């Protein structure tokens, strides 16, 4: 029932439904034929804004985590952090490790201080199941972790060198180190109207950052601002300005406070490094 990659959320695992969902009833309950709650209506696929028979609901297992966080007084939902980069298992990879079909999530890289590394996961491992629940792809793994509460451990079934092994992974949140230090840029510059935060494991996960290990993240862009006009996007990582590295929000704030005849800006977007030059 669940569909991923809808582009609606960072934890984009939804129940797809043909129930009519319109702006007025989003947030309502999605129930089965026995009146059991299975999800909360969240979004529709529509160009007109009205229902066209393709709707999406947040699965009830994820809703439970949000409710528990609210009851405990939390200001945000903290989800378990794996500390690993994952990729889809291709047919060629599946054949090479003895799988009869492409399933699971391949470990491509790891944070040396993350839960994956602590548990003994290695590059090239394929995560096949979480607590006995089969994993089809990286998005499926994200969903399984997203329904877990912080604290304790979860059991991974891993394929390594043609053999299955069990590993216990700690359920801990992504650390926010360095601190977020949110700054909104109002100085005349290509970034005017953008809100930036420091890059950390927590903000990288929150804004779906891929590949970047240094820089600051664009968290928000005001409509009709200079940053919007220049097509900067939420989740872009600003790595350097005029070949000077940007390590923190304060670095960027100081840089835009100076006059420049031109702006050579290098960003990371979706794992790709892009460089653009703008007039001063």
Where are these regions (language model features)?
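C-terminal recognition in membrane/secretory proteostasis and scaffolding
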Residues: 37, 62-280
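Short beta-strand scaffold segments in enzyme catalytic cores
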Residues: 29-30, 156
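Active-site loop architecture of trypsin-fold serine endopeptidases
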Residues: 2-27, 33-70, 74-79, 138, ...
């Amino acid at each position: 029932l669940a569909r991923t990659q809808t582009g609606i959320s960072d934890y984009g695992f939804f129940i797809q439904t043909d129930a009519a969902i319109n702006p007025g009833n989003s947030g309502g309950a999605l129930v089965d034929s026995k009146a059991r709650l299975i999800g909360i209506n969240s979004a529709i696929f529509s160009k007109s804004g009205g229902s066209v028979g393709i709707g999406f609901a947040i699965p009830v297992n994820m809703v439970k985590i949000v409710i528990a966080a609210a009851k405990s007084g939390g200001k945000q939902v903290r989800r378990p952090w794996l500390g690993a980069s994952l990729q889809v298992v291709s047919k060629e990879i599946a054949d090479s490790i003895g799988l009869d079909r492409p399933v699971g999530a391949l470990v491509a890289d790891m944070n040396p201080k993350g839960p994956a590394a602590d548990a003994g996961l290695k590059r090239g491992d394929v995560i096949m199941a979480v607590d006995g629940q089969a994993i089809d792809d990286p998005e499926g793994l994200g969903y399984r972790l997203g329904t877990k509460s912080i604290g304790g451990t979860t059991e991974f079934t891993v394929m390594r060198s043609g053999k299955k092994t069990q590993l216990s992974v700690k359920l801990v949140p992504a650390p926010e180190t360095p601190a977020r230090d949110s700054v909104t840029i109002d100085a005349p510059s290509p970034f005017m109207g953008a809100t930036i935060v420091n890059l950390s494991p927590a903000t990288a996960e929150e804004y779906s950052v891929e590949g970047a290990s240094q820089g600051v993240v664009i968290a928000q862009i005001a409509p009709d601002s200079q940053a919007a006009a220049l097509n900067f996007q939420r989740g872009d990582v600003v790595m350097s300005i005029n070949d000077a590295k940007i390590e923190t929000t304060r670095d960027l704030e100081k840089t835009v406070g100076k006059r420049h005849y031109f702006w050579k800006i290098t960003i990371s977007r979706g794992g790709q490094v892009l460089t653009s030059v703008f007039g001063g």
